Curated annotation (Swiss-Prot):
Descriptive protein name: Bark lectin isoform 2
InterPro entries documented for this protein: Kunitz_inhibitor_STI-like_sf (IPR011065), Prot_inh_Kunz-lg (IPR002160)
Annotated disulfide bonds: C33-C80, C126-C133
Role: Glucose and N-acetylglucosamine binding lectin. Has hemagglutinating activity against human and rabbit erythrocytes which does not require divalent cations. Inhibits factor Xa and, to a lesser extent, trypsin. Does not inhibit neutrophil elastase, human plasma kallikrein, papain, human plasmin, porcine pancreatic kallikrein and bovin chymotrypsin. Has insecticidal activity against the termite species N.corniger. Induces apoptosis in prostrate cancer cell lines DU145 and PC3.
An MF annotation (GO) of this entry: carbohydrate binding
Keywords: Disulfide bond, Glycoprotein, Hemagglutinin, Lectin, Protease inhibitor, Serine protease inhibitor, Toxin
SMART domains to which the protein is assigned, alphabetical: STI (SM00452)
Amino acid sequence: AILTGVPYYILPSTSRAGFSPDNLRKNTSQLSCPLDLITQLRFPRRIGVPVIFTPQNSSLKVVPLSHNLNIHTCSDLWFCPESKIWTVKSSLTHGGSVVTTGGTFRSLGSWFRIERHGDSYKLVHCPRGSTPCRDVGIETVGGGGRRYLAPRDRPLAVRFTRASG
């Protein structure tokens, strides 16, 4: 079970590589805010940055499947004025929508869900807090092959590992 308010890594079910906000560890003068979420698939030993799940029903101690929740990047290193809450926004840089930070707690546009996907799980984005929701998958952008989380027809199968300490 995934516990509310406890940090977890979101990992692709077939890899140890996780997700982290783009540019989080770069020189702060080069930051472009808000920070889009990238995969660390090219760096399989990097498990990314943990997140905290907060269900819409804040009295729940366990995060339920197929219910609205906010995803909050759990990092002490943060240089952007925007929030650490995940949302989906259009990106001129990437030519489509991407999962990014800067969402608003408990508001439309920042709702995601965890759903079963075979033997794994998947994330879906529910912009209105109800259906239709869209699967979150991988979008490869540019010659450098950066892989961003984005609404896609093909979901990324994921698993969750509790962050230690």
